[in-house]
Amino acid sequence: SMVRRDLEPYQTASNFIISQGWGGNSTATANNNYPNPDIKPEKVVSYEFGGDFRFFNSRVGIDVAYYKSITTDLIIPITLNPSAGYDTKLMNVGKMTNQGIELMVNVVPVRTKDLEWSLNFNFSKNKNKVVALAEDKGISRIRQIERWASLELRTENTKGDGSYGSLYGDYLVYKDGQLQLKNGLPVEENGDWGYLGNVNPDWTGGLGTDFKYKNWTFSALFGFQHGGSVYSRTYIEGMRNGSLKESLAWRDADGAGMIVADGIDVETGQKNTVAVPVRNYVQAYYDNDMIATFDASYVKLRELKIGYTLPKKWLKNTPLKNVSVSAFGRNLFIWTDVPN
């Protein structure tokens, strides 16, 4: 199939933004987006095929699908030089592909008069690639979010991993697994920001189970994600300021307040022997984005539920036909390496 994604109304016009001002008076301010009358709708070409299979009187079901989409004329706001009087300009700047697989499996291992046990499993994986940007217009990278670490679009030939959702930031220098130090303090990479990870997971999935025994029901639902990265500025500030429990490891009970860090002195090429104040070392070590980027993999217990359906004979002399009582909990536990 082929579809066109158009802009929202008035996005190509040089209109004013109306807001509520001081004292209830309305104010009108100029739009900070430079109007582009030549912009075209995005073009999306998609392919998908799959199958739905049932076996053993539908006690085993498999639903699988493969898809691929190609998006051209991507509409992205491009940051302008402030001297232009505008912040951004919407432009058609590239091509991006997505392809992946989605799988659902349903199984009923046990089914008797009084007991039934069912399992359901789902899995999905998507591979994204930024094929091209507007290199002919001097646009080889686009920063979508920039505060500390940066969420950027880059192709593979611009020191990027070539996929949507990539994180870039500053990082400490390691050589042969050894932290590089100068004057006893960690050395931070100078120059272009390095690749930290991608916010999108490698794959996601879920597992659910249901038990039914006579009038009782019990169900559990798990969700899981493998891969992906998450950036936490809270972690950086908490470690630098000593407000996180992990920062206790840096404190000296004797009050000496000095540390000889494990690493290589860049000036001598030998093991570091320079002692520096702990406070200075901690602030230098945690003043980079790499240290606050974590693997976003997780396993979640999304829901537990237990229920009981009252026997119909108990309702015989009432206007009620069915009554069920349930207790459930949602988002009960999460297992992950991301710090709280």
What spans do the regions from the language model cover?
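Conserved SET/PR-domain catalytic core that frames the SAM/AdoMet-binding pocket
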Residues: 120, 191, 201-214, 302-307
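Extracellular/periplasmic, surface-exposed regions of secreted and cell-surface proteins
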Residues: 1-154, 288-340
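Conserved small-residue
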Residues: 91, 108-199, 239, 250-251, ...
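A short local loop/turn or secondary-structure capping micro-motif enriched for an aromatic residue
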Residues: 71-72, 189-190, 227-229
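Glycine-rich, aromatic-lined ligand/substrate-binding cores of catalytic
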Residues: 198-233
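Generic beta-strand hydrophobic packing signal
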Residues: 170, 207, 216, 304, ...
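Short glycine/proline-rich turn/loop motifs
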Residues: 29-30, 186-190, 281-290
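Extracytoplasmic gating/loop element in the C-terminal half of outer-membrane beta-barrel translocons
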Residues: 227-324
